[in-house]
Amino acid sequence: MRKKEHNKYRSKSIFSDRDKFPVTDENNKGRSFRKTDPLNIALRFIKFRMRSKWEVENKLRKEGFNEETIGQIIQKLVENGLIDDEKFAYLYAYDSLVIHYKGPYRIRYELRQLHVDDYVIEDALKKALSEVDVNEIIEKLTQGLDEKKKREKLYRHGFGGEW
């Protein structure tokens, strides 16, 4: 009886239409339903860090789901704000600058590898670079090195000649 009362008050969530995404025997491969449900796989994949739309699509393709199912899952995740390439690109650029001391050229290259659109990359880089003191990052990165070594290290980390 308690279970029915609980279900009566449940709000609609992104999990409510799971039966729209059929899991066929070819996808099952002996695993439990939880591990073969495309929505569950996508949610577990984005659980630990933000992902680009392409990364999630690629993950679902590797799991063996058809394009129609992948499209439905991606649409649902975008509608619920769980996938947002603009937000992803900004956070990736900001973290790469502040935590990993990567320069704009390297960040741009890595985001292109993740199939983020060029205009989104440029906006994210502008925003991240405006919020970070790049000279401070360069100082930390090249502390105690002679001029030749500084220049080499800056190029390796993705800072161009203008720094």
Task: Cite the ranges covered by each PLM segment.
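An alpha-helical, amphipathic repeat domain used for nucleic-acid recognition
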Residues: 1-163
